[in-house]
Amino acid sequence: MLTLPSSPDFRLDNQRALVTGGSRGIGFAAAVALARAGAQVWIAARNAGQLSEAAGLAAQDGLRLQTLELDITDTAQVRQRLGALPDFNILVNSAGLARHQPFLEVSEENYDAVMALNLRATFFLSQQVARRMKAGGIAGSIIHISSQMGHVGGPERSVYCASKFALEGLTKTMALELGEAGIRVNTLCPTFIATELSRASLSDPEFSRYVLDNIKLRRLGTLEDVMGPVVFLASPAAALITGAALLVDGGWTAT
């Protein structure tokens, strides 16, 4: 017999969310989107001034973003400061670093810096949050902000690509191990998004042309393009999605 299905639920009321790298760019946009969907949101970053600015801007829209000054590469600090907070239902790992050089010129310093933030810090912060989700019986959602560069190569992006490919592998393993606890783990993989971080690279006409030639929709991504997918992956509407990569790349990886 035909029955009418219920509509998917995109609301996040009574959910607690932590967004790393939440004072700028994609992280800030993700935090705003989650707050607008009803979540109680903490934004984490190292710079107290930037955190205050982000929270103040959100407040002008009637949103409350709680701030957490945190260096996520410091695992002892992560344990201490997260220990003083309630358990989270949602984690968005948006903190990241890119240092672009030709492969033959990459220094150990730049390699270590990118891997320390993009992979190691994300790994151990996620471990802390997931342990508490499992212990508290929370069927949570962990979203790693990865990149299209976790699926393709890119010139002068050997270390960045390596960190994001590794993050994709980590996501699948986390999904396998945490699924029985009801914890979902996915990546959101944007193309080039118009932010402060990307402005310098995209100001090069040759590089900008390369980017737009590869984005099939022939435009850069915007922060708004990322906000909906973040809410979707965090929400009950994505209840059966785990171990997946949601590509928000304008078709870059389609070929």
Where are these regions (language model features)?
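Active-site helix of classical SDR
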Residues: 126, 163, 171
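C-terminal substrate-recognition "lid" of short-chain dehydrogenase/reductases
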Residues: 184, 219-248, 253-254
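Active-site loop immediately N-terminal to the catalytic Tyr-X3-Lys motif
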Residues: 104, 152-158, 180-181, 218, ...
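Substrate-binding pocket helix/loop in short-chain dehydrogenase/reductase
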Residues: 102-103, 107-115, 211
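Alpha-helical segment proximal to the catalytic Tyr-Lys
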Residues: 131, 176-180, 239
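Conserved glycine-rich cofactor-binding loop
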Residues: 16, 23-25
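Residue(s) in the substrate-gating loop at a strand-loop-helix junction
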Residues: 147
